[in-house]
Amino acid sequence: MSKRLFTSESVTEGHPDKICDAISDTILDAMLTEDPQARVAVETVVTTGLVHVVGEVRTSGYVEIPQLVRDTLKEIGFTSSDMGFDGTTCGVSVSIGAQSPEIGAGVDTSHEVRGSSSTDEDDRQGAGDQGLMFGYATNETPEYMPLPISVAHRLSRRLTEVRKEEIVTGLRPDGKTQVTFEYDDAGTPVRLDTVVISTQHDPERTQDELRELLSEHVVGHVLADESLKPFVTEDLNLLVNPSGSFILGGPAGDAGLTGRKIIVDTYGGMARHGGGAFSGKDPSKVDRSAAYATRWVAKNIVAAGLADRAEVQVAYAIGVARPVGLYVETFGTEKAPVEDIQRAVAEVFDLRPASILRELDLLRPIYAQTAAYGHFGRNDLDLPWERLDKVEELKKAVGGN
């Protein structure tokens, strides 16, 4: 049996790119609170002492963007210039323009409605852009996520928890985690090989102290879960701040940008990605809503016992309501013919944008909570695309062939 090692990473909410995702999604949520039909595309850039918010918006509401930016930074933990960034005193610049009327028209009145006499309301809304989106699920974990990204997220969330609750003192907001699992030839995880923890910290903290404290309170805490014990061996390779001191972090260490952690946001590299980011985009943008919908589809396929792993691709043309492509991949793990599974998916799930918005109830301020620690497999959140409400319909549709 060959030794195959697969790695996924996560980052904490204090990572510069994740700061930007949080700001963009906080602004989005505020706009959806004021106007559920708001069209929002907000990008954030952070650098030393300064936050830039840019984008295009169409809304009947008003939100105080600079205050939202400062509140988000302080909630993450950037409250002092001593750590290189202070949400109270940093500069905030805002450059928000109007959504292109041509894009807006294509979303409001789809190609189908403009070109025919269709009276189906779900045909009225066109896709906000062309593109391809992927959803994925696997039975490796109870949350139907790949094990490496699941554990990486648990570690990064715990790293933030011990900082905020002062279980470990002297930590700062920026941090990253990475895990490597050994897989057998059947594609099953068999052993945890390497864990990497990098965390920003106060100058007074030594690396020996950090290794001891994080080994106990972060790594040990997470790996004590009964479901993970079979993967842990004595030869686990644990690396804590392997580059040495990490005092300067956050925006003072690296500039950050919305949408630059798309693999962290999804499946840790275990599945394909269409390239579109999520944060700062209202759900008329299929980059976001269709990626959520295909996760919903894939998760229900696996939960229905139709495959051990499932990846679903959907594709759209701008201004067109009906998808131009649907593709189901089961990697040889299917329990029924793939063509029957794909036919059942097309029968059970309506992937037109208007239907996705209605079925998943997406015109709500639910997005800021997803800005860090992944958009999928979040048992700590009540996310509509994680529901297993189509399992029986899929079974019936496949069985009725």
Swiss-Prot record:
Belongs to the AdoMet synthase family. Residues 99-109 are annotated as: Flexible loop. This is S-adenosylmethionine synthase. Mg(2+) binds at D17. It is found in: Cytoplasm. Pathway: Amino-acid biosynthesis; S-adenosyl-L-methionine biosynthesis; S-adenosyl-L-methionine from L-methionine: step 1/1. It holds the Pfam family S-AdoMet_synt_C. Residues 101-132 are annotated as: Disordered. One of its GO terms (molecular function) is methionine adenosyltransferase activity. Gene3D superfamilies: 3.30.300.10. It catalyses: L-methionine + ATP + H2O = S-adenosyl-L-methionine + phosphate + diphosphate. One of its GO terms (cellular component) is cytoplasm. It comes from Corynebacterium urealyticum (strain ATCC 43042 / DSM 7109). Its cofactor is Mg(2+); K(+).
